[in-house]
Structures are given as structure tokens and as C-alpha cells.
Amino acid sequence: MKKISVFTSIRSEYGLFSPLWLALKANNSFKLELLVGGAHLVEEYGNTISFIEADGFSIAYKLPFLYKGEDPDALTRSLSTLQLQIGKYFMENKPDLLMILGDRFELLPVVLAATLNKVPIAHISGGETTEGAIDNQ
């Protein structure tokens, strides 16, 4: 059985990812492990982890990495925390594949940790412009 880890951090990914998650969950050849963090775990962003759980998905690992604020210090602390958390997950769980969606800046520490742990990465989508996003300034 192949262990497929999927990282998600914002509500907008859920609608795009969920059909794939359902297919993986239904296939006995795969073990789906959801790595949920960021805005999904924050009340002011809707605590959207509850939507994922309500649809019957179990969460393998919660990643509470967001520091309050969007200044360079808060962003640096957030991304550093995420890299430590997800790096630990990769070392302990050794997934066969990591799936990510989009091109948000919080994916940088995720893919770096996966690369350092020799976890292959499946990248879905990217390149869209999000007004005001740090990578589009």
C-alpha cells in the first residue's frame, strides 16, 4: 500500500482537492494522509478543518504554524515553524508521495522538507495570479 500525503492550508484548495481525496480513499492501493494546517485551523478564517472532517476525511497531522500578522517577522516565524513541523512528519512517517496544490508561499517550506527527506512531490496547478499575495507583488 502506497502512503500518499496531501498538504492543505486554505479553504479554496478543498473544493479542488476533495474529488481526488475521495478517489484515493476509495482505492485500497493507497493510504491517504491529510496534513492540514494554516488557515484551516484558525477561527477567524472559519476553522475550515471542520468541513474536511464533516465530509468523512480523517486528519493524519495538524500543523498549527500561523503567527498573527503579515509582516516579515510573522511570516518568517510561520514558515520556519511549518518547516520544522512538516520535516518531523516526513522523517517519522516516510510517505511515498506528497501532493500539493497551487503556488502559495507556504508551500516553499513544505517542498523543501519533502526534498530533503527524498519524498517525491506531485504538484497540481499553479501560476494563477492572486491580487495582493506576497508572490505577486
Predicted regions and their residues:
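N-terminal subdomain of nucleotide-sugar transferases
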Residues: 1-40
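Conserved nucleotide-sugar phosphate-binding/catalytic loop shared by glycosyltransferases and other
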Residues: 31-75, 85
